């Protein structure tokens, strides 16, 4: 055992985890070139040299029905991984995101004396806060993207390290707006608004009509307003086009396949659903309004479960409302348009907002891959 190379177990459950895992492996190999990586890996992690025992897609299930259908298989995989990692006894096991799968696995491995890390904090600070106790028992360390996440874990004496956000590392502090416009075919002097009604089908269904009606109202004020709508895949594009044909068939918009980041950088303002898109928009230095609606019963439940004063990451990072959030009954075209309109004007307020975005960007731009690798190595030597 003493002569073997540093051995790291990893399990990633979806594409975002594969990206994080690949970055972590790269950073570890830069320090320990002969380290061995094994577990459940996507194509990017495999390209960096990680052996995989199962295809990552086996773990990538979404929605209650799909999870229930696949549950016997998922439980079988987790049992087998527990056995394999117990036999292998890696120096450290890193569960990358996929908390419903990984945290239980981490707990079982920790009971067997294997050091465990959970990479990417679940949103325990926002809802189902009691999960923090399970996480504390299951892991030796949580790696958190955001400083308020570490502050939350500190309250419960759960070891946590703030490593910064990989997206903040990937995006420049000063984005090139003119280059983004040239790429998307938008004139340098045009006034431009990005509409981002979400990446999930339910979000696109709930928000697209009101976002389009908002754009119509703004067009009466700014007749030459350019509208760009990046959609994550062909399914969401088809869905959006159907809604647009019903709600605003005459409205002129540029539909984009993906290219959400370019659209944000190119635009003067954005109207978007909450989620990671709001963080990305902040990093793009694009002033935004967050609009979000759920089914009434879901919203009723969320109001009782969610423990944070804001829903968008820019506001949570700032600790105050720097971005307008219009939720549920407030997410209507006249209110959305009234909030977006000032952002389309050059003003000291929008300049100040962009400066705040820059300050927040710098606060979470810490070299996350390298920080994560350092945490793994320190735990391996502990």
From Swiss-Prot:
NCBIfam families: lpxB (TIGR00215). Keywords: Glycosyltransferase, Lipid A biosynthesis, Lipid biosynthesis, Lipid metabolism, Transferase. GO terms for biological process: lipid A biosynthetic process. Its EC number is 2.4.1.182. Pathway: Glycolipid biosynthesis; lipid IV(A) biosynthesis; lipid IV(A) from (3R)-3-hydroxytetradecanoyl-[acyl-carrier-protein] and UDP-N-acetyl-alpha-D-glucosamine: step 5/6. InterPro entries: Glyco_trans_19. This is Lipid-A-disaccharide synthase. It catalyses: 2-N,3-O-bis[(3R)-3-hydroxytetradecanoyl]-alpha-D-glucosaminyl 1-phosphate + UDP-2-N,3-O-bis[(3R)-3-hydroxytetradecanoyl]-alpha-D-glucosamine = lipid A disaccharide (E. coli) + UDP + H(+); a lipid X + a UDP-2-N,3-O-bis[(3R)-3-hydroxyacyl]-alpha-D-glucosamine = a lipid A disaccharide + UDP + H(+). Pfam families: LpxB. Condensation of UDP-2,3-diacylglucosamine and 2,3-diacylglucosamine-1-phosphate to form lipid A disaccharide, a precursor of lipid A, a phosphorylated glycolipid that anchors the lipopolysaccharide to the outer membrane of the cell. Belongs to the LpxB family. GO terms for cellular component: membrane. GO terms for molecular function: lipid-A-disaccharide synthase activity; phospholipid binding. The gene is lpxB.
